[in-house]
Amino acid sequence: MSQYRFPIRILTRFYTQASSRLPPKSLLIKQADRIRRSKDGQADGSKLMVSSLKDIASMFQANAETPEDEEREILNQQNYLRQQIESGELERLLQDKFNLDESISLMSTNLLVQQFPKLNAQQVELIQEAVSMDSNKHWNEIPQYMKQLQFYFAFGSHGPRLSIPFNSREKPLDFAFKIPSPVTTDGQTKIHKLKPSHLVNLHTITDQRSKIFQTTKLDPATRCILWSAILVSIVFGVQEWRLQQDPQAKITVLSNSV
């Protein structure tokens, strides 16, 4: 009996040590990137599942990157972007793409809406780093064009808000309420729930947004794989529970297998 328990203990110890390892940041970044690409229609559910399994398997490889390596890589990239900003690369990019006028410290709003979706990943990352750097400053110390970028990142026509008109003088189409709720402090006004006709379906504002939410659904092949994995996990879980409840059954199974 002891000769069978010994390898089981080793396997249990190895599984415990491996499962206690924290997932590296690269895995989280890759998963976030795949979700974004799947929403844009660039990947289907099956490819997403296969890619996720590959990343999980890479965690157990001897040459896999550690969390410290990931943090060092992110820090180096951040330092590189800040050096680019300090060298004036950001201003040159904004002047070229959005017609930045340094005399009034403003950009063309129309160009911002039209040209921003055409930027490549490196250019967007440079702008995002600049916006994050200025977010800690006092509002009066932030340049006007950086305020424009902050406002665009918060409310502009990009990502899920793609194809929604960007006009600061009008209420956005995806505003939650068609009729705004009044503010009351007298304690006498009755509060009631808004009718469905007074609400906006945020999922069907535009065709582009509707497609984004449709692509998040799992295809039949992925659902089949997922339910199969759940079923196998339940079966093995029940068998493991039965073995733990009846030690004699474990001895019988091992002795019969010899």
UniProtKB/Swiss-Prot annotation:
Its main location: mitochondrion. The chain crosses the membrane at residues 221-238. It is found in: Mitochondrion membrane. One of its GO terms (cellular component) is mitochondrial membrane. It comes from the Eukaryota. Keywords: Membrane, Mitochondrion, Transit peptide, Transmembrane, Transmembrane helix. Disulfide bonds: none annotated. It is a single-pass membrane protein. Involved in respiratory growth and required for cell survival in the absence of prohibitins. Belongs to the GEP7 family. This is Genetic interactor of prohibitin 7, mitochondrial. It comes from Zygosaccharomyces rouxii (strain ATCC 2623 / CBS 732 / NBRC 1130 / NCYC 568 / NRRL Y-229). The lineage of its organism: Eukaryota, Fungi, Dikarya, Ascomycota, Saccharomycotina.
